[in-house]
Curated annotation (Swiss-Prot):
The pumilio repeats mediate the association with RNA by packing together to form a right-handed superhelix that approximates a half donut. The number as well as the specific sequence of the repeats determine the specificity for target mRNAs. It comes from Arabidopsis thaliana (Mouse-ear cress). It is found in: Cytoplasm. InterPro entries: ARM-like (IPR011989), ARM-type_fold (IPR016024), PUM-HD (IPR033133), Pumilio_RNA-bd (IPR033712), Pumilio_RNA-bd_rpt (IPR001313). This is Putative pumilio homolog 13. The gene is APUM13. Its main location: cytoplasm.
Length: 527
């Protein structure tokens, strides 16, 4: 092989050039003799180069040449070389100096120290260690300190890096490590071995190590640890966490992780703290509405209402005023309607007076809305709203607007639900309210369902409704919806009423045979 350096197109020396030739060049330039062991082999192993030998003259040592030799032998990491840090395996770093080095050896390589560079080497080593510690602190804050899937890392906590760190600081660094998933974990949470569990210290250390309590509460992993602290925490712990979260509690209520923290914290709060929460939540009514509209925010508001009901009754008027001012908006939202339902369930009619007035005055607008329709049906349920006065007031408003509601795609369900309550007094009021309009309702797609529902009730006199239908019998026999009402009236009526219906059917039988809806009646009744 030609004893010359070969240079490729990138300006790098060919890896087949011998280290011996390079060492000879170095020796010639520095007027120093090479040790015999370095001349005895054509390809030198890195271990033969990494030792401290006083035979080397510090003034003659060329770190750049030695590094280029290692790179030529493919023992240097090109990525690290670009950053100015030559790399060797971790166990070889410890042969050079006592410090740093992890499973991938992200430490610093120092040249063999001679008498000339002895103090300079110590200063450089101390500077690099300080830089390494500072880098670790910055990496932890920026969450850039990571392990790969096989446990490799920069090794900041391994070997003898902490030898020069005082015990207190060393423990402060070691208490937090980063697992293979990139999430910071506190050792004190994983095990109680060798330490006394203290909630205050744990809560304080979490905030100091991870950031503010707000950041902890919104983190997928740390929020669970914060929940554990709240669950078993003392009053001092709860106060500390509450002070850290109260400012951003509106944002936490709609956060997927912070929501659970807030709900658990509200259950542990004192009456004074609940007052502060009410102050913050109701300060901006638009924020309050957005929380109620949110699928998880509405749950937090319901938990707050429960806590107010149990431990802060003096705050009921304040929270009810806030809810009543936006009640119409809340009733029309699929999530916020449960806030209204929770108020009717927990509070008395006197406490809900203003809210009940708002809902009653806008009963028709609420009933013709899809979500409002569902809300009213749930309000009629005795189990959901035990207060009879509230239920009776809402039912009365529905009966008052029954005619218009029967003609609506959503409102007709509210009227049918009132019928299904099977309250004789309320049913009689509804039947009388719709008199002289049954023929009109029977020709409507939605109203026909209400008329059929009333005809099937056993507690009322169906003859009253059938007689009212006879006012428009000629059109009903040929109507797409009215024909179903006539069929139902036939089957639920007694014989005397059927004879009346038969008379009108036979009078219009020719027209009915020419109409597909009239034919349905004839086929169904076998006429």
């Amino acid at each position: 092989m030609d004893n010359k350096f070969y240079v490729n197109t990138n300006g790098e020396r060919n890896i087949w050039s011998t280290a011996a030739e390079e060492n000879m060049t170095t020796a010639a330039s520095s007027s120093q003799s090479q040790p015999p062991q370095m001349q005895s082999s054509k390809f030198h192993q890195p271990e033969n180069h990494i030792h401290i030998n006083d035979g080397f003259s510090s003034g003659a040592f060329d770190l750049q040449t030695l590094e280029s030799s290692f790179r030529g032998l493919s023992f240097a990491d090109s990525n690290v070389h670009q950053n100015g840090n030559p790399i060797l395996p971790a166990h070889q770093y410890n042969q050079v100096f006592n410090g740093g080095g992890g499973s991938y050896g992200d430490g610093y390589l120092f040249p063999p120290s001679g008498s000339y560079h002895h103090y300079e080497l110590k200063d450089l080593q101390r500077f690099n260690q300080n830089q390494q510690r500072l880098s670790y602190q910055n990496d932890y804050v920026n969450q850039s300190y990571r392990y790969d899937t096989i446990g490799g890392g920069n090794g900041m906590l391994n070997n003898s890096f902490l030898n020069g760190v005082p015990c207190a600081s060393r423990n402060n660094v070691s208490d937090y490590y980063t697992n293979i998933f990139g999430y910071g974990v506190n050792n004190s949470w994983r095990s109680n071995e060798g330490c006394t569990y203290n909630q205050d210290q744990a809560a304080s250390s979490m905030e100091n190590g991870r950031g503010s309590y707000f950041s902890i509460a919104t983190d997928r992993v740390w929020s669970k640890e914060l929940e554990k602290t709240i669950f078993v925490g003392t009053k001092e712990t709860i106060d500390m966490i509450f002070d850290g979260l109260i400012v951003g509690i509106c944002e936490l209520m709609v956060d997927p992780f912070g929501n659970d923290v807030v709900k658990l914290l509200i259950g542990k709060c004192s009456s004074e703290q609940i007052i502060l929460i009410v102050d913050v939540v109701t300060r901006h009514i638009s924020k309050f509405v957005n929380i109620c509209f949110n699928p998880i925010g509405t749950l937090a508001i319901q938990v707050l209402l429960t806590s107010i009901h149990e431990r802060a009754n003096n705050q009921i008027p304040r929270i009810m005023d806030a809810i009543s001012s936006v009640a119409l908006q809340l009733t029309r939202n699929t999530n916020a309607k449960y806030v209204i339902l929770a108020c009717f369930r927990m509070f008395t009619s006197s406490q809900c007076r203003r809210l009940l007035e708002v809902v009653s005055q806008h009963c028709y607008q609420i009933a013709i809305d899809q979500n409002g329709c569902c809300l009213l049906q749930q309000c009629f349920d005795k189990e959901r709203v035990p207060n009879h006065e509230i239920r009776q007031r809402l039912i009365s408003e529905v009966i008052e607007h029954a005619l218009k509601l029967c003609l609506n795609c959503h409102g007709n369900y509210v009227v049918q639900y009132v019928v299904e309550l099977d309250n004789q007094h309320e049913t009689d009021l509804l039947v009388n309210k719709l008199l002289r309009n049954y023929a009109h309702l029977a020709r409507n797609k939605y109203g026909s369902h209400v008329v059929q529902k009333l005809l099937k009730l056993r507690g009322i006199d169906s003859k009253l409704i059938v007689v009212d239908l006879l006012r428009g019998i000629d059109t009903l026999l040929l109507d797409p919806f009215g024909n179903y009402v006539i069929q139902t009236a036939w089957f639920v009526s007694k014989e005397d009423v059927r004879q009346m219906l038969r008379y009108y059917i036979e009078r219009n039988i020719r027209l009915m045979r020419c109409n597909k809806f009239g034919n349905k009646i004839l086929e169904k009744l076998n006429i």
